[in-house]
UniProtKB/Swiss-Prot annotation:
One of its GO terms (biological process) is FtsZ-dependent cytokinesis. It comes from the Bacteria. The gene is ftsB. The lineage of its organism: Bacteria, Pseudomonadati, Pseudomonadota, Gammaproteobacteria, Pasteurellales. It comes from Mannheimia succiniciproducens (strain KCTC 0769BP / MBEL55E). This is Cell division protein FtsB. PANTHER family: CELL DIVISION PROTEIN FTSB. The chain crosses the membrane at residues 4-21.
């Protein structure tokens, strides 16, 4: 009877080891869950960025104002008979 209990205990320990440390065990599960959470956060951030870009594309396709704004800010273009003023910020170090 003692031998039977020893064998059952050994099998139980083997199963416990496999459960905690084996392939697809608890530690692998926790590691995979952390990776999934990290990827979900990254996907959320990328999805928000995609929405901003899609809105900008829609605005550029549909409206003239967005094109004018981009031309003014990025390329410093002006309309005919319009005066362009650039106001430089004062550098605090050069006072």
């Amino acid at each position: 009877m003692r031998l039977f209990i020893l064998i059952l205990s050994a099998i139980l320990l083997l199963f416990q080891y496999d459960l905690w440390f084996g392939k697809n065990g608890y530690l692998d599960y926790k590691e995979t869950a952390e990776e999934i959470a990290m990827h979900k956060a990254e996907n959320t951030k990328l999805s928000q960025r995609n929405q901003v870009v899609a809105a900008e594309i829609r605005d550029l396709k549909d409206g003239v104002e967005a094109i004018q704004e981009r031309a003014r800010l990025q390329y410093e273009l002006v309309k005919p008979n319009e005066t362009f003023y650039r106001i430089a910020k004062e550098n605090k170090d050069n006072r």
